[in-house]
UniProtKB/Swiss-Prot annotation:
GO terms for biological process: co-translational protein modification; translation. SUPFAM superfamilies: Peptide deformylase (SSF56420). It comes from Shigella boydii serotype 18 (strain CDC 3083-94 / BS512). It comes from the Bacteria. This is Peptide deformylase. Belongs to the polypeptide deformylase family. The gene is def. Pfam families: Pep_deformylase.
Length: 169
């Protein structure tokens, strides 16, 4: 397994729409494993393949405290959503920035697991929010797109400054 490079805004590759996975094979499973390794290394709770410049419909999530409840979503589809909620969300592609984002309180999805087996999942709370956040990535949408233009500009400037400082170090 290896840690992949996470793209940061304003990288336009984050805006690409991911294509469906045609076959879950050893290559896809390797990508899933690398994505988990990357997500844990970056201390995230979710990661979409788009964020690591792989434009396929793959998501990995682990919202557990012990980091031992891996969830793989390949070709996820939103079937139902209900209620309203929101938390201050962060994103590995928008480092050290957070903002309140409106989300559905509950979701029902269909996806393939790491072995290509179809399943359905009903989720609420943090897991439901994380699923929605990561599914947005698959269509090129970021949490900051829900914010006002002024807030978006401020976030972009802060991230660009952080990346410049990191490049000098």
């Amino acid at each position: 397994m290896s840690v992949l490079q996470v793209l940061h805004i304003p990288d336009e590759r984050l805006r690409k729409v991911a294509k469906p996975v045609e076959e879950v094979n050893a290559e896809i499973q390797r990508i899933v494993d690398d994505m988990f390794e990357t997500m844990y290394a970056e201390e995230g709770i979710g990661l979409a393949a788009t964020q690591v410049d792989i434009h396929q419909r793959i998501i990995v999530i682990d919202v557990s405290e012990n980091r031992d409840e891996r969830l793989v979503l390949i070709n996820p589809e939103l079937l139902e959503k209900s209620g309203e909620t929101g938390i201050e969300e962060g994103c590995l592609s928008i480092p050290k920035q957070r903002a309140l984002v409106p989300r559905a309180e509950k979701v029902k999805i269909r996806a393939l697991d790491r072995d290509g087996k179809p399943f359905e999942l009903e989720a609420d709370g943090l897991l439901a929010i994380c699923i929605q956040h990561e599914m947005d990535h698959l269509v090129g949408k970021l949490f900051m797109d829900y914010l006002s233009p002024l807030k978006q500009q401020r976030i972009r400037q802060k991230v660009e400054k952080l990346d410049r400082l990191k490049a000098r170090a």
